[in-house]
């Protein structure tokens, strides 16, 4: 069982970056450990709730912009297929190489990684 008479101490910093020792104190009413600097927060007033009647709020502007961008991305994805067709090999790549049989010089194949192929030893 924990000894609630001795507080748990920890380091804390204030707005001026000064370090001091804070302690956690046992609150018998709440049955929880609360920081000693949190005393007096019972009167804390939260920020007022969002007013949905204001149409110029930052939230509604961001939501509208994100919806518009998502719609544009869907349109671009449906109509722009260049990145997918570039992955399909051309028909000439699938032909067997008959150049050697006809007496023509065989074509030099392009290396997949040209920068790496320029460094290979001779």
Curated annotation (Swiss-Prot):
Biological source species: African swine fever virus (isolate Tick/Malawi/Lil 20-1/1983)
UniProt GO MF annotations: DNA binding
N-acetylalanine, modified sites: 2
Basic residues bias (residue ranges): 105-122
Renumbered residue ranges of the record's region Disordered: 1-27, 85-122
Recorded family membership: Belongs to the asfivirus structural protein p14.5 family.
The protein's name: Structural protein p14.5
Coiled-coil region list: none
GO-annotated biological processes: symbiont-mediated suppression of host cytoplasmic pattern recognition receptor signaling pathway via inhibition of IRF3 activity
Source organism superkingdom: Viruses
């Amino acid at each position: 069982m924990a000894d609630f008479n001795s507080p748990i101490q920890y380091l804390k910093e204030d707005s001026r970056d000064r370090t001091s020792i804070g302690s956690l104190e046992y609150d018998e009413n709440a049955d929880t450990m609360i920081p000693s600097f949190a005393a007096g927060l019972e009167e804390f007033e939260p920020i007022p709730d969002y007013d949905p009647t204001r149409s110029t709020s930052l939230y509604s502007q961001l939501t509208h912009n994100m919806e518009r961008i998502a719609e544009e991305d869907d349109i671009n994805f449906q109509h722009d297929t260049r990145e997918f067709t570039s992955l399909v090999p051309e028909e000439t790549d699938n032909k067997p190489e008959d150049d050697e049989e006809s007496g023509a010089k065989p074509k030099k194949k392009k290396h997949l990684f040209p920068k790496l192929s320029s460094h290979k030893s001779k």
